[in-house]
Amino acid sequence: MAFKIIEKQPQQIVSIRVVGPYHETIPKGFDQLSSLYTQYQIPGKDWLVLYWDNPETNPPAELRADVSLSVADDYVLPPELSDHLQLQVIPAGLYAVYHTRVSDDDYAKAWGELYNQHLPQSGYRPTEGACYEVYLNDGRADGYFDIDIYQSVEKDQ
């Protein structure tokens, strides 16, 4: 699939924080966010998940992710949603982007290809910034997920 390095503008999102094994908590987060999206007619565009912990080094019960929906820069979170959602900004900067298809929920394969194959060959390395997936289709309906994985990067020294 396609791999590239891009300069990205900041992106505002609304999010629900989930904690626990990713394969259990992220689908529940999508269900919650989807319900709020419909109920409150949130003017969102892209569905994404920000990852804060590495499942290879952190215990599953402590894994944190933000199930998110991109919104316009001028979007203001209504007071009735402030107990449910957090408004945040994915920072601008240099990102590696890997476009791939995930079948059989094998996200580990996609992430492994990014970190073990594409990034080492690119001349860039991951930084401590944002790391997230953007979902490009309804994988529950289609039986597979087309995704873009974004990882903040810097040039190798």
UniProtKB/Swiss-Prot annotation:
InterPro entries: AraC_E-bd, DNA_gyrase_inhibitor, DNA_gyrase_inhibitor_GyrI, GyrI-like, Reg_factor_effector_dom_sf. GO terms for cellular component: cytoplasm. It is found in: Cytoplasm. Pfam families: GyrI-like. Its main location: cytoplasm. Keywords: Cytoplasm, Stress response. The keyword Cytoplasm applies. GO terms for molecular function: DNA topoisomerase type II (double strand cut, ATP-hydrolyzing) inhibitor activity. Coiled coil: none annotated. Inhibits the supercoiling activity of DNA gyrase. Acts by inhibiting DNA gyrase at an early step, prior to (or at the step of) binding of DNA by the gyrase. It protects cells against toxins that target DNA gyrase, by inhibiting activity of these toxins and reducing the formation of lethal double-strand breaks in the cell. HAMAP family: DNA_gyrase_inhibitor (MF_01896). NCBIfam families: PRK10016.1. Belongs to the DNA gyrase inhibitor family. Interacts with DNA gyrase. PANTHER family: DNA GYRASE INHIBITOR (PTHR40055:SF2), TRANSCRIPTIONAL REGULATOR YGIV-RELATED (PTHR40055). This is DNA gyrase inhibitor. It comes from Yersinia enterocolitica serotype O:8 / biotype 1B (strain NCTC 13174 / 8081).
